[in-house]
Design a protein with these regions (language model features):
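Short hydrophobic beta-strand element within catalytic cores of glycosyltransferases
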Residues: 153-157, 162-163
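Acidic donor-binding loop of glycosyltransferase active sites
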Residues: 122-139
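Conserved catalytic-core segment of nucleotide-activated headgroup transferases in glycan assembly
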Residues: 1-122
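Short glycine/serine-rich donor-binding loops of glycosyltransferases
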Residues: 141-144
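Donor-sugar nucleotide-binding helix/loop cap in glycosyltransferases
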Residues: 147
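Residue-level detector of conserved catalytic or cofactor/ligand-binding positions
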Residues: 207-213
Length: 214
């Protein structure tokens, strides 16, 4: 399963913090049977694309040893003070081969010329199975709207204008309908993290049900 979040580097407002927390909880869930690849597509103080990663991508060999700092596609000018990297370290996430959840942090603008992915944002969005935008503050929020427009189911919150609009439709909403709107407040960070984890798990079960038997 490929999931992802994106947007400006507003660590709390965009819900990047709670997204990472949910990934950590999902990784520790013993009931998780499928691999999850989670992208954090958020432009940071980006430096150069990683030459060691470029070399591996060009090589026809297979590698079983992780690179140094196995989360990141491009070096940052503030490697020791980046909030995403700091939180991944705090959570103890490491992208070990045995981990069911692995995180890829893409800290550059996706314009098709970044030197690693060389895809624009919408190409990457189309490659995802699910998007997550757990905003703490968002007057409207185009990212979940764009996700749905590209037929990629999304998770958002009722602190985003788009999430409030979906709830106002008074129709049954949920991830099986394309949009899961989680309640978010100043005091329910942990509940939101669990809500994301549980919604991803539910989505995995829906995919399993819809898959043809072999």
């Amino acid at each position: 399963l490929i999931i992802g979040t994106s947007g400006r580097y507003e660590f709390k407002n965009k819900g990047i913090d709670v997204f990472l927390e949910s990934l950590n909880r999902l990784c520790r869930d013993k009931n998780l049977k499928r691999d999850v690849l989670a992208f954090v597509n958020v432009p940071g103080w980006v430096g150069d694309p990683r030459e060691d990663l470029q070399a591996r991508l060009k090589s026809k060999d297979k590698f079983d040893t992780p690179l140094e700092v196995p989360f990141i596609t491009h070096w940052l000018h503030n490697m020791t003070h980046d909030q995403v990297l700091d939180m991944l370290k705090y959570l103890g996430m490491s992208n070990h081969p045995e981990d069911k959840v692995k995180v890829i942090f893409v800290p550059c603008y996706l314009n098709g010329r970044d030197g690693i992915l060389n895809k624009d944002y919408y190409d990457l969005l189309l490659g995802q199975d699910l998007s997550v935008y757990p905003s703490y503050y968002e007057p409207w929020g185009y990212t979940p709207l764009e996700s749905v427009a590209f037929r990629v189911p999304t998770i958002t919150t009722d602190l985003a204008g788009f999430g409030l609009w979906v709830k106002s439709l008074k129709k049954q909403n949920g991830i099986d309908g394309g949009v899961e709107v989680l309640h978010r407040s100043d005091y329910n960070y942990s509940e939101v993290a669990d809500g994301i984890k549980d919604t991803v798990s539910l989505f995995l079960s829906l995919i399993h049900i819809s898959e043809p038997t072999r």
